[in-house]
Amino acid sequence: MAEKLRGSRVGHVPVMTPEEAVRWNAVKRYVQPRADRRSIGRYGELLSGRFLRYEGATRRRFLRPLLADASSITDADLEALLFEGWRPRLTAAWLIGIARRTSYRARLGALLLASETVYAGLGYCFALARFSTPEDAEILAAYLDRYLPRTDLRYDQTLAMGALLYVDSRLGTAHAAPYTAPGGLYQRWVDAVVHETDRPAYAPDQELIAMTRLCDFADGWTTPG
């Protein structure tokens, strides 16, 4: 009999290790559901911000399961989603941020600083903005210290700036001021990375507006009974 290889298919059922099965089930349950039939999945709805425009039944199909999952997902499933891949990590970070599970602050901060995958940084920055404590400001500032000088990289600098400005607005602090000063690190990064005609859209006040919109929308959600 031919040897079964990990990841092979027998009767269309993947052969997995127990750990892989846990991750697969978590992805299927939390990452793949979609509120809109035209959507590629929850992760795509969160990434695109399309949910901000949802109305009526589509809005309910998006919000109710999302809020229920954010309040009920186990630590084991969150760890499974955070294990690898931008889609699961993005979704996990949103669930963490919605429920304000601050016990994951250090983990999300480490993932943000490592910047191993694309797109997931949106979720990390959203969650840290939702937490809005001095510790979150420190993490976001550390990210900007590391990546704003890297004008060869276009990662999550704008998202981190928006999140830090949002935290400042909540705490009455000015952690972002050194970065947003004229000629500061943020302006130099934007000037080096962004085309001149697009730079107004990356202004600090625009990044704050974008993050505030996400957090205000989340603040308006209620946990389903």
Q: What are these regions, as identified by a protein language model?
A:
Residues 1-73, 181-225:
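N-terminal alpha-helical scaffold/docking segments in eukaryotic complex subunits
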Residues 49, 53, 57-69, 90-100, ...:
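Structural detector for internal amphipathic alpha-helices that build alpha-solenoid repeat scaffolds
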Residues 70-81, 101-113, 133-147, 169-180, ...:
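Amphipathic alpha-helical scaffolding segments comprising HEAT/armadillo-like alpha-solenoid repeats
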Residues 77, 85-95, 104:
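Short, well-structured hydrophobic secondary-structure segments
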Residues 86-87, 117-119, 150-154:
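Alpha-helix N-cap/helix-start positions at coil->helix boundaries
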Residues 134, 144-145, 151-159, 163, ...:
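Extended amphipathic alpha-helical repeat scaffolds
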Residues 160-190:
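A contiguous, mid-protein "functional segment" used to position or interact
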